[in-house]
């Protein structure tokens, strides 16, 4: 009732169905419409896309330097491109208006051809790459004021110190606290800390450093 389909016949039928007819769906990258050609060059939407980016038309200096650059490079093979550009710029400034005029005419002709070929062209200068932001977060507390806690007899007491002179005094206090002292040491520390806070509001850092070095904490025997 139903004929058995050979595998070779089935494969040939699939290939014949997938192959488009010649001339009916062929792709032609260039057309008579300059707008379509421009879209083809710029990736379909008129924007720059890699190697298909539309270049700006040459100005008078570029028209003149096109042959001059090749000439200078042949005469000085060891000269770098940046040095050649500087030399060409100096030579271009030394030319008279009459000597520059043929290159201005050629540049105008090239610009007219460019407008005819790419009517939707707009100059888009390349943006400079922005520096990447660091992932590290800035400290919430200023470096001039740091706060630490001192452990005295299993109790934490906040201790604030400013600048390097106060840090040195605080380190000496921590060393002295490490050797088991009476609990009234904490009271002395808190009183001295209150004194430092009151004096830091009206004294300069130099005066504060003098107070810290001249008045060490008193510890009862």
UniProtKB/Swiss-Prot annotation:
GO terms of biological process kind: cell differentiation; male sex determination; sex differentiation
Family annotation (CDD domains): HMG-box_SoxA_SRY
Gene3D superfamilies membership: High mobility group box domain
Subcellular location: Nucleus speckle; Cytoplasm; Nucleus
InterPro entries in the record: HMG_box_dom, HMG_box_dom_sf, SRY, SRY-related_HMG-box_TF-like
Entry's Gene Ontology molecular function annotations: calmodulin binding; DNA-binding transcription activator activity, RNA polymerase II-specific; RNA polymerase II cis-regulatory region sequence-specific DNA binding
Keyword Membrane carried by entry: no
Record flagged with keyword Transcription: yes
DNA-binding span(s): 54-122
Subunit structure of this chain's protein: Interacts with CALM, EP300, HDAC3, KPNB1, ZNF208 isoform KRAB-O, PARP1, SLC9A3R2 and WT1. The interaction with EP300 modulates its DNA-binding activity. The interaction with KPNB1 is sensitive to dissociation by Ran in the GTP-bound form. Interaction with PARP1 impaired its DNA-binding activity.
Family: Belongs to the SRY family.
Known function: Transcriptional regulator that controls a genetic switch in male development. It is necessary and sufficient for initiating male sex determination by directing the development of supporting cell precursors (pre-Sertoli cells) as Sertoli rather than granulosa cells. Involved in different aspects of gene regulation including promoter activation or repression. Binds to the DNA consensus sequence 5'-[AT]AACAA[AT]-3'. SRY HMG box recognizes DNA by partial intercalation in the minor groove and promotes DNA bending. Also involved in pre-mRNA splicing.
Name used for this protein in its record: Sex-determining region Y protein
The organism of origin for this protein: Cystophora cristata
Organism lineage: Eukaryota, Metazoa, Chordata, Craniata, Vertebrata
């Amino acid at each position: 009732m139903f004929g058995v389909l050979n595998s070779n016949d089935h494969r040939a039928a699939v290939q014949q169905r997938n192959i488009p007819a010649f001339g009916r769906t062929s792709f032609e990258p260039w057309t008579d419409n300059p707008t379509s050609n421009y879209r083809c060059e710029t990736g379909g939407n008129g924007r720059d896309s890699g190697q298909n980016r539309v270049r700006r038309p040459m100005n008078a200096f570029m028209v003149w330097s096109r042959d001059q650059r090749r000439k200078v490079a042949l005469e000085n093979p060891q000269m770098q491109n940046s040095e050649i550009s500087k030399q060409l710029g100096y030579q271009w400034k030394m030319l008279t208006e009459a000597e520059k005029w043929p290159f201005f005419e050629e540049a105008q002709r090239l610009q007219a051809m460019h407008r005819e070929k790419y009517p939707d062209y707009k100059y888009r200068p390349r943006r400079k790459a922005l520096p990447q932001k660091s992932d590290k977060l800035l400290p919430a507390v200023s470096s001039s004021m740091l706060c630490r806690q001192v452990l005295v007899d299993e109790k934490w007491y906040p201790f604030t110190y400013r600048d390097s002179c106060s840090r040195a005094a605080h380190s000496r206090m921590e060393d002295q606290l490490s050797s088991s002292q009476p609990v009234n040491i904490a009271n002395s520390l808190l009183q001295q800390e209150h004194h430092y806070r009151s004096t830091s509001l009206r004294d300069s850092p130099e005066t504060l450093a003098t107070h810290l070095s001249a008045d060490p904490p008193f510890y009862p025997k």
